[in-house]
């Protein structure tokens, strides 16, 4: 029985999106560095990361360094998800569809998305505390919240993990059937 393959158009699409995931990950990393290191952008970076609008914040060099470190945790998790997606897409572009390793890669992508959904609220809360800890007494904030987008990411990550597990199992069953025939 011949190995199922991906049509050429989809293989090209997988290769292109794979390149886009790598470019996106690098862009996010560089943008995060720039937002925290370019002085006129730091206020915007701090407010976006901490989910603050008009509340007073205190940005010192040490707060900037810690803010960069905390936001880098979130960016590292996002980069891991994008890198995993890239590896999965390259397998698909090569025609490795119904194989155990493809299911494992899909499951890893789901885990990475779920991890990003878990890290995002924590980094937001930490950044909120960091940028307000230098405020006058009574104006230090810590906000811990989970947005509907974060919940959807967690759900999608979980579903992708499950589909990856099913695909890995299906590939093993297909291999067993090939050996019988």
What does each of the following model-derived ranges do?
Residues 20-36, 107-124:
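Hydrophobic alpha-helical membrane-insertion segments
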Residues 12-20, 56-72, 100-117, 144-156:
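Alpha-helical membrane-spanning segments of integral membrane proteins, especially the hydrophobic core
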